[in-house]
């Protein structure tokens, strides 16, 4: 999967209120620049970060009771996304 496809999927989640949860567990990481990573998490407030060895897990909160968890690592100054999970709390 390429960045543009991931961005489109994330945007669809935010636009379509009928989608309650979206979880992408990837066989192969999506490699993005830091600027592209910021596009994915835009408008989110980082509430918690857990880092161990070379893996990082970020927890974000967005408006309209939307939350996300992003599991990634850094390689050659790029962000390698392993898993991304968005959900709406009720």
UniProtKB/Swiss-Prot annotation:
Record CDD domains: AcrID1
Gene3D superfamilies: 3.30.160.300
InterPro entries assigned to the protein according to its UniProt record, in alphabetical order: SIFV_Orf14
Name of the featured protein: Uncharacterized protein 90B
